[in-house]
Amino acid sequence: MAEAVPASPASGLGLHRGIIQWLVDNFCICEGFSVPRCLMYEIYVETCGQSAQNQVNPATFGKLVRLVFPDLGTRRLGTRGSARYHYDGIYIKKSSFFYAHYCYLLGKKSCHSGNLIAFGKFPDYSNVLQQEETCENHSPIKKDPMGSPVSPFRRCPVWEQELANKYSCKLVVFLADEYCNYCRDILQNVRNQELEKVEDLITSFWKSRQQDTVMLMSLPDVRQLLGCYDMQLYKGLEDMLLPDFLEDVSIQYLKSVRLFSKRFKLWLLGALEGFPAILQISKLKEVTGFVKRLRRKTYLSNMAKTMKMVLKNSRRIGLLKSDLRAIIREGTLDISKKVLEGDSDHEEEPESHTEMKCLGCLISLLETSTDLAELLNCVSSNLQVLVFQPSKNKEDFIKLAASFQLKWNFLLTAVSKAMTLSHRDSFGAWHLFHLLLLEYVIHILESCIEEEEEEDLGSLQDLLSDDQFLTQPDQALFHPLDSLPTSECASRNVESPQVTLKHTSQSCGPMGMGSVVLQVLGFLVDTATGNKLVQVLLEDKTTESAVKLSLPVGQEALITLSNGQRFVIHISDVPQSSENTYCRKSNANVQGGLLE
């Protein structure tokens, strides 16, 4: 191969741009396929680098390949002595002018080496074509014989109403309707195995957004609402694509699932080109999490599928059990007490540590069961006792999870080391089991953190939609927010009313007025009558009783708390410039019977 010759920066930059464009025009991401590095460079030299002055060396060419495909993997394929490095996850486009030549060279090299160099199984041109068609056309959705409909997509009407109250009502309502329909359509098309329509749905939705809608979607609280809907979308896709990684599915199916998730991400990022950076970052974070979770589950599924085959082999599992018992019994594990003890002040024997107990439970279970689900449930039970139950909050959980994972990894690695040094025949089976146990613990811990984040978002929804009070006043004195079907949120320039609170109790004793708090929650307009409504919360901290009301402006309401205290709330309009105008969600203490 020719080495690159010195060139001026300008000519070098132009040369690199040409190579990058050549890579983009002729190669694409294709999960499950690989391209030999030497063959890719050979085609480049034959087609683009015929002049020595216009060639780059293989190292520079490899850097440019990774610049175009940053997530590209590398695999060494072939038998011992004739293995070659491959770029894993890309393939030459069928529309490429060099496609036929590439297939010819691929078959030629395969025949000469006596190996199947590429990930494809066939050296001839027609079979390579057939395999690529299989990859592209294989649907990653299993047919549902029951034909069950897509899970209901949960709307957040009160949350939407809060945002509409803060911004333009019509624009928020329109955006929420459009976005939810967009998510539902994606789920329905995936359920119907119409994956080719998903790209069009994504592109058409984002490219049809007007500038005012885009700016609204970029606001922090609106992004949070849309993130809630994205969470439901991705959760629904995961449940349809791969609900359980222990389910028996084909390797080709797993490849198709990974390919679809990666394509989904590319479709979304492509549709978001030109949008505000903050919106792109938000959507990138959400879709990256979706791709990461599916990749983790497909990886686990692949390992579980292989491990099940090992567990069905009585000879292999017998060797594994005897070798593990021998290693534990002979004390050949190279384990440092300091590593297992961590922050513990008392010394214990290595066998008495929690991680050793967890491993001991697995070894004992192998004596009676070869069901992979039972083995993994054993790990889950130990995690529940050692990590989940002792955690008082999220910080404690993260600390305990990190500590367990570190010690668990160290322990399993020590077993692998002992297996290697003692030349155990079951090393291959243990190595697979080792990887599966590591990934499964990571899956459980990361899934818990993700679910907790989802629960936090769900709690926010519940908080915004909660119209229940500790003490219910007379129904004639108030109108609950959810009981106003004709109400819509007022625009932001609605005048804030003045709220006055008067104490009317006949008791002669001290009344503890400082413990009563009146909070203005929001403003509404009844479109049917044109009346202004104010949502307020009256709370007595001493008795922990509260009343949540939606009151019309210009009227009084008589409120009785559970301790017998009675109050009159009067709401009146004031000019916008008045110093007594109260902002939304402001707290105020009652002093002298009036709201200051």
UniProtKB/Swiss-Prot annotation:
What keywords sit in the KW lines? Answer: DNA-binding, Nucleus, Transcription, Transcription regulation
The organism's superkingdom is given as Eukaryota
Q: What Pfam families does this protein map onto? A: BCD_RFX, RFX_DNA_binding
Principal subcellular localization: nucleus
Q: Does the keyword Coiled coil apply?
A: no
Q: Where in the cell is it found?
A: Nucleus
GO molecular function of the protein, one example? DNA-binding transcription factor activity
Q: According to the UniProt record, which residues make up the DNA-binding region?
A: 19-94
Which Gene Ontology cellular-component terms appear in the entry?
A: nucleus
PANTHER family, A to Z: DNA-BINDING PROTEIN RFX8, RFX TRANSCRIPTION FACTOR FAMILY
Its biological purpose: May be a transcription factor.
As for family, the record states: Belongs to the RFX family.
| Record-given protein name | DNA-binding protein RFX8
Q: Which organism is it from?
A: Mus musculus (Mouse)
